[in-house]
């Protein structure tokens, strides 16, 4: 399960004309390459911050989506010299290398038609739901997002009745609301159920290519926290 959520975002207007005029346009040049600021990255004092160039480039292999009235276009982020400043670029490179090596192996088995092998991933996301009032009483949860003290966990599978057990109405309402929010973003869930520990649950999406799956998982974690807040819950990832 993926636990960490970290993503970057820059918002540009597509109404560039001044003087009170509006002309909606979005050029291909802006889509192919943008120029946000990369001065926040550590450089060891080797360059002035205003000279820290970072470029975004459109990633057409992942799906665009609309969130909060903005068209979100997945991009890669690299330096002026082409070095990766994100985690998407190494992922795309690794997918290309896996495809290249897999096609090479297929050739050894006599397959002469396959040109590319696509990596498919369906990253399940496990999470805990805690009531806000109880969450506020636990300093370890508020500071660290996880428990640092408490009762010892049972080691004899005494809690086997929770796994695949009936989902509580409050949690079921949360899951239903989460599904609807994810559908708006083009993320389809395949499975949802209780997990082994108390208040632990799981959501598994439909398999898609690894690049899009990673992008969608970031959206899943973001929406899990937002939807939980509406239901008086706190989502721990």
PLM regions: where:
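Single conserved hydrophobic/aromatic residue that forms the stacking wall/gate
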Residues: 1-12
